[in-house]
């Protein structure tokens, strides 16, 4: 998570005095990178994933499950292990392969929570299709190595949040008193955060800059026996340890909301992030733009966060909770008071959805941009004067409206243009759902794009499936020159929609109707590139070479997640409600059919195609509702637990059983045993996984069946394309 430099961290009053200098030096470093790397070319597209784990203390003999705060000890054990050899019962052949040098061992990193670990592959992945099928095994290896360096009762699990973090009583091992000087939280101790000086300083300076504690309020789910209006019973209105304890007496904890008051409730969440290296800056900017509208769709599809602080929430995803947990805006910047000491009103937290498009794509219309975007005009002019184009200068001038939160005194002695520390101080604390990453100062790697919205999934199979899916989408985007542009404010709206309970099934999202590029023929007629890469002229060569653009509002409409992922025809066939928003000629092909059409256009053996089909099939079924999201499964697990009183309370007993089930699923996945024996013991596993953890082949009909399926998918895509062309 961001920079882990060492030094003397400045408290906010001192840091505030140096903020302008850090921004100025950061821009100089950015221009140094820009001028050095703007012409950089890379032959291969590389990518990597980041998996975040919660570490829990769990024993069947103990009455409760706790968060383990031994991150530092675990990381030290991993660092001291010279070879990271895998012992115990990891996947067959793993240790032998590692010893033989055939497996690149993973890298482990600290995170904000002292109960968290982050793991990344030891080297970036390429785009060879067979390599995509090694991702899942690598994720299993990471989890196995981490477990081997923990105590016997410690387990790395991939739940987004620990259900009872911040609940009354003991929820960590070891346990500490709450209301410490850094977080000043009623609910969690300072010791829950990584002790590296960056993390407590980040939390303290966010609070200090705001002038009050962060306010993370999540609507509570109203069940049959939930008191209404509901008042958070864990809030102590009589606490007087710190001035910020007045927050709850001043309305920070409204009725019918679960109230949380510290950065740990956001940055203590786990997620799945994917970073791509583009061949050059142009391709990177294009990927950034085209993946941006997909963010809310994948957020809803990976929903896995229905519980906070021991209560069931009326939302399914983590995004806004993290946004609020690191929101450093002052009352003036929030619009609560007139501007006097601050420069502008800022509509979003520094953890938010994107506010800019940055590509040089000619299809990027001005109407897609945010008309109320806040930028620093002086910084933009500096970037323009330094040779940066207007679009990218606008992007960075927007990021640099923020103050640096953590400043080390040692870094203020002189400007070093061989580093990027001041630039990254601002860049890495703008946590948007996409991040555009310039090369480092030594220019050793290329321009990168980070896809950040997805929730972590319970199993390595699921996390591999979503990782590979995003990679394949980027390949289809670049190969077919797809266009997913919608106004950026509609992406914002979609991000809010994604938070709703069962949003993947019950909500609609703004999405572009026609993703296909329109080409011009030599004779002046228009043509459209098909999903197979060929150019098919349309009838009517008398059409103008460049047809006039219609209203932007005609380019997009509301679609379900099922329709976006699987296509209009599939959604109509599988949904109870017919898609009413699709008028004649507005059928959307679907992301999976587009990906499958791309796969059909490249050389690939059937075994590899079957392996990829297994991942796509999981996503297809999650989108259609045939399989549940993790959020839905967790809700149903709680509802069916004999200890649940239909009062929205997730007790210690329920939490232990839920975490125990997740651990058991992971253990069986690691050993390749499948989950058949758990069905009946753990409710609704078949609705979460179907047959995917039972070892069933996705290509049961053999090569002929697979080839027929590919032809059908390609026909669907081309049929939709033709309809769009006829409407032009």
From Swiss-Prot:
Pfam families: GCS. Residues 523-536 have a biased composition (Low complexity). This is Glutamate--cysteine ligase. InterPro entries: GCS, Gln_synth/guanido_kin_cat_dom. The keyword Nucleotide-binding applies. GO terms for cellular component: glutamate-cysteine ligase complex. The gene is gcs-1. Residues 517-552 are annotated as: Disordered.
């Amino acid at each position: 998570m961001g920079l882990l430099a060492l030094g003397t961290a400045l408290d906010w009053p001192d840091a505030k005095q140096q903020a302008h200098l850090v921004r100025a030096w950061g821009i100089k470093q950015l221009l140094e990178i820009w001028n050095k790397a703007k012409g950089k070319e890379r032959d291969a597209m590389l990518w990597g994933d980041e998996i975040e784990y919660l570490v829990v203390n769990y024993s069947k003999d103990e009455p409760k499950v706790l968060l383990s705060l031994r991150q530092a000890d675990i990381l030290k054990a991993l660092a001291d292990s010279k070879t990271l050899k895998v012992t115990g019962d990891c996947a067959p052949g793993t240790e032998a392969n590692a010893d033989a040098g055939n497996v690149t061992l993973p890298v482990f990193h600290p995170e904000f929570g002292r109960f968290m670990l982050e793991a990344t592959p030891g080297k970036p992945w390429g785009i060879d299709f067979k390599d995509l099928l090694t991702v899942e095994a690598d994720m299993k290896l990471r989890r196995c190595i981490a477990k081997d360096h923990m105590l016997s009762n410690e387990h790395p699990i991939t739940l987004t949040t620990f259900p009872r973090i911040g609940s009354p009583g003991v929820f960590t091992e070891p346990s500490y008193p709450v209301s410490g000087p850094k977080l000043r939280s009623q609910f969690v101790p300072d010791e829950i955060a990584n002790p590296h000086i960056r993390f407590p300083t980040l939390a303290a300076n966010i609070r200090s800059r705001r002038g009050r504690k962060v306010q993370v309020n999540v609507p509570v789910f109203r069940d049959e026996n939930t008191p209404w209006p509901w008042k958070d019973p864990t809030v102590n209105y009589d606490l007087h340890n710190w001035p910020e304890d007045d927050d709850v007496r001043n309305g920070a904890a409204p009725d019918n909301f679960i109230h949380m008051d510290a950065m740990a409730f956001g940055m203590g969440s786990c997620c799945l992030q994917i970073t791509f290296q583009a061949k050059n800056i142009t391709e990177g900017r294009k990927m950034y733009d085209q993946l941006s509208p997909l963010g809310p769709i994948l957020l809803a599809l990976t929903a896995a966060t229905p519980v906070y602080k021991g209560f069931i929430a009326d939302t399914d995803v983590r995004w806004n909770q993290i946004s609020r947990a690191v929101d450093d805006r002052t009352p003036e910047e929030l619009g609560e008071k007139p501007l006097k000491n601050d420069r502008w009103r800022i509509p979003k937290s520094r953890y938010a959805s994107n506010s800019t498009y940055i590509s040089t794509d000619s299809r990027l219309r001005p109407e897609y941009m945010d008309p109320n975007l806040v930028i620093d005009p002086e910084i933009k002019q500096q970037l323009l004067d330094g040779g940066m184009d207007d679009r990218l200068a606008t992007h960075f001038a927007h990021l640099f409206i923020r103050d640096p939160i953590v400043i080390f005194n040692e870094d203020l002695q002189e400007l070093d243009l061989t580093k990027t520390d001041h630039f990254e101080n601002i860049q890495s604390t703008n946590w948007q759902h996409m991040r555009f990453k310039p090369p480092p100062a030594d220019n050793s790697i290329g321009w990168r794009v980070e896809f950040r919205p997805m929730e972590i999934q319970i199993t390595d199979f699921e996390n591999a499936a979503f990782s590979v899916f995003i990679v394949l989408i980027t390949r289809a985007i670049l190969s077919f020159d797809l266009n997913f542009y919608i106004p950026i404010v509609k992406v914002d709206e979609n991000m809010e929609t994604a938070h709703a309970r069962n949003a993947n099934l019950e909500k609609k999202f703004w999405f572009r109707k026609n993703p296909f590029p329109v080409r011009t023929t030599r004779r002046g007629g228009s043509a459209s590139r098909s999903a197979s890469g060929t150019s098919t002229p349309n009838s009517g060569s008398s059409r103008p070479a460049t047809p006039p653009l219609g209203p932007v509002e005609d380019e997009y409409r509301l679609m379900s997640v099922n329709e976006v992922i699987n296509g209009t025809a599939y959604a109509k066939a599988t949904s109870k409600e017919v898609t009413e928003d699709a008028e004649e000629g507005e059928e959307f092909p679907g992301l999976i059919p587009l990906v499958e059409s791309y796969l059909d256009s490249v050389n690939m053996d059937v075994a590899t195609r079957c392996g990829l089909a297994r991942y796509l099939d999981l996503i297809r079924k999650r989108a259609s509702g045939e399989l549940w999201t993790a959020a839905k499964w967790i809700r149903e697990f709680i509802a069916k637990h004999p200890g649940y009183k239909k009062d929205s309370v997730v007790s210690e007993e329920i939490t232990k059983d839920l975490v125990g089930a997740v651990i058991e699923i992971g253990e069986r996945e690691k050993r390749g045993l499948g989950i058949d024996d758990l069905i009946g013991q753990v409710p609704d596993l078949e609705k979460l996984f179907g047959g995917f953890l039972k070892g069933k082949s996705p290509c049961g009909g053999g090569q002929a069946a697979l080839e027929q399926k590919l032809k059908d998918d390609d026909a669907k895509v081309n049929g939709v394309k033709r309809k769009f062309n006829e409407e032009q």
